[in-house]
A protein has these predicted regions:
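Glycine-rich phosphate/adenosyl-contacting loop at the front of the ribokinase-like
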Residues: 1-64, 69-80, 248-249, 313
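A short, aliphatic-rich alpha-helical micro-motif
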Residues: 2, 129-133, 185-186, 215
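Active-site metal-binding loops of divalent metal-dependent hydrolases
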Residues: 13, 141, 257
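Conserved beta-alpha-beta core of the PfkB/ribokinase-like small-molecule kinase fold
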Residues: 135-212, 228-230
Length: 313
């Protein structure tokens, strides 16, 4: 179908205000000056959608924003980055979510007002969009309280017409680490947690062990471990890959750029090892600028970085 999406993202979108420098707040009405402040695309789903579009995929985004400045900002920024936002619903009763990121070079603290983030549900998603997607990704599973109970039926529907599925759970603010997710694993083709999320969801302390346990139920499990790279499991086979070294300014959105790279490579038919290498390169390159989207690479940049790495071996 000429108007099909390679990737349809169902998820969270909200602006991120990223502060850099001496970002530890001091209460007692003390004012501190930080080095930088940037308002940019935030929300795991929106960052992933922008990253996948940058890599050349045809991407649609479905989410909910409020009828306010932050919602309009998100729509305009995603459109500017080549994402189809026809599925971005405006809720006139609630505010768009917003996140403040206190960013250090290799770590960050995140403060989020959820706003409309949790309001996405099946009835707000155009069925024609789902039917026109090669792959459907759900971001921030634990934040999407209204969508998650409906995902088993939704995934059954999209897989019945040949689409593949993926989920990035992201952090569980309640730290319960289930919410129906374990039961959904059997319908997830690619499960994309980070190291902490994988070990908490599997309830196993060691990453390799956790990934293998999750892979007994999900198709492929790919766990991000930051500067250590990533671990993937398919059946009983475990693959590890280290990321290329770059000068990191801000790791915000690196995991989402990683996801975008993995899915783009997988949808191109690449083997798991290559998808892992491309994902690692996308994650690493995305840390070169403040915020989640401004340093997201093109596929040419990724392949150049990987060829330099191969030449240096």
């Amino acid at each position: 179908v000429s108007d099909a999406f390679d990737l349809l993202v169902l998820g969270d979108g909200n602006p991120d205000l990223v502060l850099t420098g001496a970002v530890e707040p001091a209460f007692g009405q003390a004012e501190r000056l930080v080095e930088g402040a940037r308002l940019t695309v935030g929300g795991s789903g929106a960052i992933l959608a922008a990253g996948a579009a940058r890599l050349g995929l045809r991407v649609g985004f479905c989410g909910v924003v409020g009828d306010d400045h932050f919602g309009r900002f998100l729509r305009e920024e995603l459109e500017r980055r080549g994402v189809d936002v026809g599925g971005l619903v405006v809720d006139e009763t609630g505010p768009t979510g917003v996140t403040v990121v206190l960013a250090r070079p290799n770590d960050r603290a995140i403060l989020t007002h959820a706003g409309t983030i949790a309001d996405l549900r099946t009835e707000l998603i155009d069925p024609a969009r789902l039917e026109r997607a090669r792959h459907v990704h759900v971001s921030s599973y634990f934040l999407q309280e209204r969508l998650t109970p409906e995902l088993p039926a939704l995934f059954e529907r999209v897989r019945a017409h040949g689409a593949t599925t993926s989920v990035d759970p992201n952090w569980d603010p309640a730290e319960r680490w289930d919410g129906g997710l374990r039961d959904l694993l059997g319908q997830i083709d690619v499960f994309l947690p980070n190291e902490t999320e994988a070990t908490r969801i599997a309830d196993l302390p060691e990453l390799g062990e956790a990934v293998l346990a999750l892979a007994e139920r999900a198709g492929i499990v790919v766990a991000k471990a930051g500067a250590e790279g990533a671990v993937a499991a398919h059946g009983e086979r475990l693959v590890r890959a280290r990321p290329p070294t770059v000068d990191a300014l801000d790791t915000t959105g690196a995991g989402d750029a990683f996801d975008a790279g993995y899915l783009a490579s997988m949808l191109a038919g690449d083997p798991a090892e290559r998808s892992l290498a491309i994902a690692n390169a996308c994650g690493a390159l995305s840390t070169r600028a403040v915020g989640g989207v401004d340093a997201q690479p093109t596929m040419d940049e990724v392949l150049t970085l990987l060829s330099l790495g191969d030449a240096g071996r």
